[in-house]
From Swiss-Prot:
It comes from the Eukaryota. Phosphorylated by PIM1. Phosphorylated during interphase and possibly hyper-phosphorylated during mitosis. Component of heterochromatin. Recognizes and binds histone H3 tails methylated at 'Lys-9', leading to epigenetic repression. Probably involved in the repression of many genes located in euchromatin, such as E2F1, MYC and CDC25A. Involved in the formation of functional kinetochore through interaction with MIS12 complex proteins. Binds directly to CHAF1A. Interacts with histone H3 methylated at 'Lys-9'. Part of the E2F6.com-1 complex in G0 phase composed of E2F6, MGA, MAX, TFDP1, CBX3, BAT8, EUHMTASE1, RING1, RNF2, MBLR, L3MBTL2 and YAF2. Interacts with INCENP, TRIM28/TIF1B and SP100. Interacts with TIF1/TIF1A. Interacts with MIS12 and DSN1. Can interact directly with CBX5 via the chromoshadow domain. Interacts with KMT5B and KMT5C. Interacts with POGZ. Interacts with CHAMP1. GO terms for molecular function: DNA-binding transcription factor binding; transcription cis-regulatory region binding. Residues 1-28, 78-125 are annotated as: Disordered. The modification N-acetylalanine is found at A2. The modification N6-acetyllysine is found at K5, K10, K44, K50. This is Chromobox protein homolog 3. Residues 30-88, 121-179 form the Chromo domain. Keywords: Acetylation, Biological rhythms, Chromatin regulator, Isopeptide bond, Nucleus, Phosphoprotein, Repeat, Repressor, Transcription, Transcription regulation, Ubl conjugation. Transmembrane segments: none annotated.
Length: 183
């Protein structure tokens, strides 16, 4: 993506001197109006963007490396910092120390991140199973994701029974009795 200023200049040139066909020949250049949100997916930062001249229904998540609008990203990050500082001052009066606040923030971030089926991804296969928490859980690999999550077996049984069956079938072993072989 081109920077906000660069893209606007290019668009101006297109409108002043070149035909509409040239505009259509470069459909990959769009102008970012505003950065709305930020997330990390598979270790890569993505931004939720409002595109200039498009409706909110056309907003998209784009990887940071595809973007060249540092001013808009900086504005967004500064607004996020300002919002967190306001919240932080309220929490500081309630918490005993800075270190406690940063530890609880990390826990909140981890707790806020959707896990399992809440991520809205389709299950690909079950990698393993455990009952270390007292309940049977499956380690689920998701389609189009490198991350795996522990999900309750009860939930997997309801939401993806064929994947659960495939997991058990892979581990099924048959033992024949000597009497059966004689017949």
């Amino acid at each position: 993506m081109a920077s906000n200023k660069t893209t606007l200049q290019k668009m101006g040139k297109k409108q002043n001197g070149k035909s509409k066909k040239v505009e259509e020949a470069e459909p990959e250049e769009f102008v970012v109006e505003k950065v709305l949100d930020r997330r990390v997916v598979n270790g890569k930062v993505e931004y939720f963007l409002k595109w200039k001249g498009f409706t909110d229904a056309d907003n998209t998540w784009e990887p940071e490396e595809n973007l060249d609008c540092p001013e808009l990203i900086e504005d967004f990050l500064n607004s996020q910092k300002a919002g967190k500082e306001k919240d932080g001052t309220k929490r500081k009066s309630l918490s005993d120390s800075e270190s406690d606040d940063s530890k609880s923030k990390k826990k909140r971030d981890a707790a806020d991140k959707p896990r399992g089926f809440a991520r809205g991804l389709d299950p690909e296969r079950i990698i393993g199973a455990t009952d270390s928490s007292g309940e049977l859980m499956f380690l689920m690999k998701w389609k189009d994701s490198d991350e795996a999550d522990l999900v309750l077996a009860k939930e997997a049984n309801m939401k993806c029974p064929q994947i659960v069956i495939a997991f058990y079938e892979e581990r099924l072993t048959w033992h024949s009795c000597p009497e059966d072989e004689a017949q």
